[in-house]
Amino acid sequence: MIEWIIRRSVANRFLVMMGALFLSIWGTWTIINTPVDALPDLSDVQVIIKTSYPGQAPQIVENQVTYPLTTTMLSVPGAKTVRGFSQFGDSYVYVIFEDGTDLYWARSRVLEYLNQVQGKLPAGVSSEIGPDATGVGWIFEYALVDRSGKHDLSELRSLQDWFLKFELKTIPNVAEVASVGGVVKQYQIQVNPVKLSQYGISLPEVKQALESSNQEAGGSSVEIAEAEYMVRASGYLQSIDDFNNIVLKTGENGVPVYLRDVARVQTGPEMRRGIAELNGQGEVAGGVVILRSGKNARDVITAVRDKLETLKASLPEGVEIVTTYDRSQLIDRAIDNLSSKLLEEFFVVAIVCALFLWHVRSALVAIISLPLGLCIAFIVMHFQGLNANIMSLGGIAIAVGAMVDAAIVMIENAHKRLEEWDHRHPGEQIDNVTRWKVITDASVEVGPALFISLLIITLSFIPIFTLEGQEGRLFGPLAFTKTYSMAGAAALAIIVIPILMGFWIRGKIPAETSNPLNRVLIKAYHPLLLRVLHWPKTTLLVAALSIFTVVWPLSQVGGEFLPKINEGDLLYMPSTLPGVSPAEAAALLQTTDKLIKSVPEVASVFGKTGKAETATDSAPLEMVETTIQLKPEDQWRPGMTIDKIIDELDRTVRLPGLANLWVPPIRNRIDMLSTGIKSPIGIKVSGTVLSDIDATAQSIEAVAKTVPGVVSVLAERLEGGRYIDIDINREKASRYGMTVGDVQLFVSSAIGGAMVGETVEGVARYPINIRYPQDYRNSPQALKQMPILTPMKQQITLGDVADINVVSGPTMLKTENARPASWIYVDARGRDMVSVVNDIKTAISEKVKLRPGTSVAFSGQFELLEHANKKLKLMVPMTVMIIFILLYLAFRRVDEALLILMSLPFALVGGIWFLYWQGFHMSVATGTGFIALAGVAAEFGVVMLMYLRHAIEAHPELSRKETFTPEGLDEALYHGAVLRVRPKAMTVAVIIAGLLPILWGTGAGSEVMSRIAAPMIGGMITAPLLSLFIIPAAYKLIWLRRHKKSVS
């Protein structure tokens, strides 16, 4: 089949070259128009349900809202995890779906089940699903800063809510624009209970008057003088005077009682659950642009920047928009870095080919296969919908060296056959027809084996394709693009390369020995191979023993899910104890921001504590998220690295009650979405009794702090909140004609504040709140004395119908699959993640006694690593079996297929030692490198075995298979190995040359790519030894055993 393809391609070379030209043009177009991003979209398919229950404590929100929702959503088809978050006034339910679920199908199913549960929710409470985006979609953040001092925080927030937000939402593929920080203007009506009693007016009557005084009505239309006039009755409240003039009742003497007679009306801030601060200089308002799932981040960010630039002219005097986070900077750095690495690889590979072949036109044949293979890869990426990012370009980058292997072997074989023709026809000039025939025959000779070897390299990545979840989404693009590149190289090797050789390999072909580099290689290899063939069993024994040398480096190499990716920005997410007030949270935020900004490498600090106004952010008030933009590296102090900056920040920001955590923004949001844990290592304690969960979590926190390498650990306090419990006495309430519901309505309105509508001021809408003044609700004793006017117009106090006590309780409740849980955040440095987790597990088993009904599970990146390892342990053996079948189909002998397969562990020795020398940990990235190395090593073995078989078949004594001498066998093996050392040395050289720029790279994404390249580079030390020495020695023993009766 392969022979037929090669011969038909040569016969129709004009059509083939036209097709190659078309591919190059089409591929160039796709390269230019392929969407770009920093990382693949790693987010799970999720649907967020947000339910507001204003003024309600977390326990009430959990019991009445979150619990019904989570238990119902567990039945949604395809849902794998349901997480619930109950906090003050809000419920968030995250429904995480299985891989491959269509997002919009998932949203429709969640809506279907949401309709079913709506009747179980409290009256007046309705749920809504969040935008078709995730927390990973936070691609652009900005702050509104007043440089003039003329605009307060409420004006800045109004500017964001009613102007910028709407303008930015018009940009295609912006899912949502979330407001953060500032203060929301609110009309506050502080009712004096004493005056209410004097006038005999109850609080519900005031609410009713407010609601009826803030309406508009239509009166249809009237016809006047042949014209139609539409009738409207305007009644919206638009000023404080409008509020003051609301009539509550009319006295017996006809004198009206106005709202101003019983209440004070003012504007003030709505209760704050999110605060923003910039550079330690004070609070600001801001916004977050959230990308729709699966869309082009850089295009959207460009459109956002352009829109903001046009809106600057419309801003009030002195107001400035300051960019505080821009993901396109990372995208550009990552793409530029890998693009330059690809160009470096192309250049280095070209030099290697020219040096070995000593023939420029022949080198061009090999080199031209690289851009053509790149075009093929991008064309397939275009149809698959893959964007260009660190991982997809990285797949092409690690394939560059192997892509030219087939071309190198074919060119070298053509050189060899043309050289042989010259020896057989001394003094003759080869004609064009004969030259095409020789080149075609040379291609046919090695084509099938090369195609099989490239197919093995391609299939070796099957385990990567089977990865699921976050690791599958991360390494899937790399596996796809590497496969496309290798598949393109395989197709080019049997279709285009023979034709290019026919066109360009002309004139006098330099003999192999005329190249000084080749002479050195042959001279060095010749005596070593003779000794190996003289002592084949000793050679194999030494090789087998060398495999055991990896035991020690393996024991020293730690484990991790992925290396930390330097995104160019940082996210500061300290863990704080619960129960902090908004004022204290704002002060703490400004203090930490000011300390962070004092580090010279920091460009800007945008701090946020609490949540932004979006369903994608469920952060409680005590949760700090500070975005740190770093200056370009050329502006850093000499010798500074990202790790040194983090260490300095950690030393600088040392405040009581804070457990510091410094993480990359995208990486952190991905982890929080996938596992819910914001730190690299997380521990989830689940149970049924909150006090037991809390006690267990705090015990684990104490023992985890003693583990070497742990720099911070903090367990969430489920019982850390402070509650004022109002326990209504039903009997006492009934004596005053009040029900429990009446008292609860009074508590929620007078103390918590009741929302009684909103004002309409152009496009702006501002809430109206009614409650008692602060003096009546600033202590438990004041609450007891709070006046109540009963339905029978009796004056009593709250203490007459209820007992008031101060107790502790949860500030936030978390559940996973409807089971309450407490999360413990662990940050470790100086040790690998797997070792730290194993030590924590040991400490927990020895020192922590679990309460009945509680369970402990490790999460975070460790959970992802375990999931990936479990899948690889299943798929790697299956892939090895597939490779064995391919080898058998190639050689039609079990012993020869086993020879290549059994020798692969030796090729991995160099990779393991090199990994240890570089100080890298075992991870999914290094595992990917080892899988790629195994495929390349198998290719080396196939090519060497092919040369040895050809040499034996061409030997006059061995080809008869009657009798032969061991010397004759050694001579044939010598010709197959030594006289073909050039192509083997070239393949090693081009692979190493292609990988070194990746290993030495320092730009965005280099952390992952260097881990993939390291095992392959180390393996290029032992894999050639496998091909050059072990395969010939083992093949000699196999041949002798197979023909032992013919030995003379």
UniProtKB/Swiss-Prot annotation:
Molecular function as annotated in GO: antiporter activity; monoatomic cation transmembrane transporter activity; xenobiotic transmembrane transporter activity
Q: How does it sit in the membrane?
A: Multi-pass membrane protein
One cellular component (GO) term of this entry:
plasma membrane
| UniProt entry keywords in alphabetical sequence | Antiport, Cell inner membrane, Cell membrane, Membrane, Plasmid, Transmembrane, Transmembrane helix, Transport
Transmembrane segment boundaries: 14-34, 125-145, 338-358, 363-383, 391-411, 446-466, 485-505, 539-559, 737-757, 871-891, 897-917, 928-948, 985-1005, 1012-1032
Where found? Cell inner membrane
Give the matching InterPro entries: AcrB_DN_DC_subdom (IPR027463), Acrflvin-R (IPR001036), CusA-like (IPR004763)
Quick one: where is this thing mainly located? membrane
Q: Which residue pairs form cystines in this protein? A: none
Question: Which top-rank group of organisms is this from?
Answer: Bacteria
Which function does this protein serve?
A: Component of the sil cation-efflux system that confers resistance to silver. May be part of a three-component cation/proton antiporter.
**PANTHER family registered for this protein in UniProt:** CATION EFFLUX SYSTEM PROTEIN CUSA (PTHR32063:SF19), PTHR32063
Sequence similarity: Belongs to the resistance-nodulation-cell division (RND) (TC 2.A.6) family.
Name assigned to this protein = Putative cation efflux system protein SilA
Classification lineage:
Bacteria, Pseudomonadati, Pseudomonadota, Gammaproteobacteria, Enterobacterales
Q: Which gene encodes it?
A: silA
